[in-house]
A protein has these predicted regions:
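Phosphate-rich cofactor/ligand-interacting catalytic cores and adjacent structured alpha/beta frameworks
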Residues: 1-26, 30-31, 55, 68-184, ...
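Active-site cofactor/substrate anionic-group-binding motifs, chiefly glycine-
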Residues: 28-48
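Generic beta-strand or strand-like secondary-structure segments
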Residues: 36-39, 43, 60-63, 67, ...
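Conserved phosphate/anionic-ligand binding catalytic regions in large, soluble enzymes, centered on
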Residues: 48-65, 69, 189-205
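A compact, surface-exposed functional segment
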Residues: 208
Length: 216
C-alpha cells in the first residue's frame, strides 16, 4: 500500500459515501443502505486492484453518515441512530473480522458502531485539547483493532497497545521520534493499526453536528 493507492481508493469511495447519505435522508431502510455499502466496497476493490485499503473505514463512515441522515430527518441522538442502524445490518460472514471476533473475542469496527462509537466519542473530546498524533496514539492504546489481531494475533495487538501507551507517557517533545521508531518496527513486523487510523479519520472528517463536543 502507498499514498497513490489510498488516494485512488478515496476517489472511488467518495461518491458512494454521498450516495449513502442521500439514501438515508430519503428514508432508505438498512437493507438499501447495506446494498449501497457493498457496491461502494466493490468500487474500492476495482480501484485498488483487489487491495483492502478502506473496508473498515467504509463501514464506520457509512454507518455514521447514515445515522446523521436519520438524525436530520427524525431528531434524537446521532449515536443512538448509529447503534440501531448497525444492529439492523446483516452481519458479514467468513471475513477476517469475523474470524478475529471468534478467535479472540474482540469486536472491532462493528462492535464500536453497535455501542454507539464510544471510543470515537472519547477521542473527539481529546482532540479538543490535543494534536492528532496524540489522539492517534491514544486510539492505538485503547482500540480493539481487528486488523492487528488478524496480522499479529493477541501478542501483536498487545505490543501496539503497550508501545502507544509508553509513547504517551514519555515527554511530549520525544513523541514524534518515538512514534517514527514505532512506525519502523510495525513495518518490519507487518502490523498496521488501521482501526485506530479509521477512527481518527472519522473524527477529522466530522463536525460538531456529529460530535457535539467537537468544534474544530
Amino acid at each position: 500500500m502507498d499514498l497513490p493507492l489510498f488516494l485512488r481508493s478515496i476517489d472511488a469511495l467518495t461518491p458512494w459515501l454521498r450516495r449513502i447519505t442521500a439514501l438515508s435522508l430519503s428514508g432508505a431502510d438498512a437493507a438499501a443502505l447495506q446494498a449501497a455499502g457493498l457496491e461502494a466496497e466493490a468500487a474500492m476493490f476495482r480501484a485498488t486492484g483487489g487491495v483492502n485499503t478502506h473496508k473498515g473505514a467504509l463501514f464506520s463512515f457509512s454507518v455514521l453518515l447514515a445515522a446523521l441522515g436519520r438524525y436530520l430527518m427524525e431528531g434524537g441522538d446521532v449515536f443512538a441512530h448509529a447503534a440501531a442502524l448497525a444492529a439492523e445490518l446483516t452481519p458479514p460472514r467468513d471475513t477476517h473480522g469475523t474470524e478475529v471476533a471468534r478467535r479472540h473475542q474482540v469486536g472491532g469496527a462493528r462492535a464500536e458502531a453497535l455501542a454507539g462509537f464510544p471510543t470515537a466519542r472519547k477521542a473527539a473530546e481529546l482532540l479538543q485539547t490535543h494534536d492528532p498524533l496524540t489522539v492517534l496514539l491514544w486510539l492505538m492504546a485503547h482500540t480493539e483493532d481487528t486488523n492487528l489481531y488478524h496480522r499479529g494475533g493477541a501478542e501483536g495487538a498487545a505490543f501496539v497497545k503497550e508501545q502507544a501507551a509508553a509513547i504517551l507517557a514519555a515527554p511530549p517533545e520525544q513523541r514524534v521520534a518515538l512514534t517514527q521508531a514505532l512506525d519502523d518496527a510495525l513495518i518490519e513486523c507487518r502490523l498496521s493499526p488501521g482501526g485506530s487510523a479509521d477512527l481518527l479519520a472519522l473524527l477529522l472528517n466530522s463536525s460538531s453536528t456529529v460530535f457535539p463536543s467537537f468544534d474544530r
